[in-house]
Amino acid sequence: VRQTDIAGNTSAATSFSFTLDTSAAAPGVALTTDSGSSTVDHITNVGTLNLTSVETGATVEYSIDGGHTWNTSFSATEGVNDVQVRQTDIAGNTSSATSFSFTLDTSAAAPGVALATDSGSSASDHVTNVGTLNLAGVETGATVEYSIDGGHTWNTSFSAVE
């Protein structure tokens, strides 16, 4: 930039450079670990997120209430987590939000076990001539394993022995 005054004198040039930044891209969001039997079902026992396309120096914000409030940190809770993520770059541009949903499941309840038939002289003495078990509380998709040696070895099938 330079100027010429009304007397016809031209100043030395002043250099000035700047970067015009008018937008911020929405960040990519994925689970850090999608654990369990499927690596793409968004069910995990680790509730941390992996963000991509975050600009250097940008502030990342999370919303768990549909975008009404935003925070700079996020902690997953047991069960379904619906989170939105956005970034505000160093120029002050705020991206659109990326929505991501996943289920955090950090524990499996012990299943209930009972004899299918307690045929002994008492219906509650666990003496039977039918070695079939009934299970309760097994989660859909869970793998059931049996141990007959105090938990040293486990198998997915069970056959009662006399």
Predicted regions: what they are:
Residues 1-162:
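Low-complexity, disordered linker/stalk regions enriched in Pro/Thr/Ser/Gly
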